Regions:
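Compositionally biased terminal segments of proteins
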Residues: 1-230
């Protein structure tokens, strides 16, 4: 959200959602091989994860970036024989399928590993779909940044939360969205609930008044969204 008044804290991990429909006939294995052939990636601590070191050019130590591979839980990817990477397996998640509904194209300009200027175009999850993924995430793990990401999107989306809520309303028959709504209602039921308190934990403010304001703000942002979803 480059137009946001408050910048996002950023991220040092990349989630790649694998579309099984398009990755047939060995294309899934070919995708992994492209990364491995660069000799820049190695297996991470998780079975569905590669890691690579990125020099930000700021004079500091390189940052380790985690690249995680996800797929919808109800699809099957063609396995490569023999395996390209021992012990590697894609993480299947119920909400992953949502990201293929209406992805947005993002142009990314930078330098290749050989130093050439280049622009590539990526399909990324829309904000509405990103929120679905994050809602499911807070329903299954304790990672404060998930709740931060949800509230950041609700508070900073350029055209407001109404279009996001309208998108979710249009998916009322989709069980993945129904579950996402239920999770948000549970996790943001009050300022003292799991979601708002995760936001407080993420910001790590020292004084009680600031922490209370952060919790209240997170709660109200989620409640506004849920009231519009209906």
């Amino acid at each position: 959200m480059p137009e946001a008044a408050t910048p996002h804290v950023g991220s040092i991990d990349v989630d790649i959602a694998l579309d099984a429909v398009r990755l047939k006939a060995g294309r899934y294995a070919a995708l992994l091989k492209v990364l491995l052939d660069t000799r820049r990636y190695r297996q991470g601590s998780k079975s569905f994860q590669f890691v690579t070191d990125v020099d930000l050019g700021d004079g500091e130590k390189s940052v380790q970036v985690e690249v995680e591979f996800l797929a919808p839980s109800d699809v099957k990817l063609t396995k490569n024989r023999p395996k390209l990477f021992a012990g590697f397996r894609v993480l299947r998640t119920e909400a992953c399928g949502a990201v293929f509904r209406s992805p947005q194209e993002l142009a990314l300009t930078g330098k290749t590993i050989r130093g050439a200027d280049n622009t590539v175009r990526l399909h990324v999850a829309s904000v509405a779909e990103f929120l679905v993924m994050k809602a499911h995430a807070i329903g299954g793990r304790d990672k404060p940044k998930d709740s931060y990401d949800i509230c950041y999107c609700l508070e900073n989306y350029a055209v407001g939360i109404e279009p996001l809520a309208a998108d979710w309303r249009g998916q009322r028959a989709n069980k993945v969205y129904v579950k996402a709504v239920a999770i948000l209602k549970e996790k943001f039921a009050s300022p003292e609930a799991f979601g708002p308190q995760q936001v407080v934990e993420f910001h790590s403010a020292s004084d009680a008044e600031t922490r209370a304001m952060q919790a209240r703000r997170a709660y109200e942002a989620a409640q506004r969204f849920l009231s519009l979803v209906g």
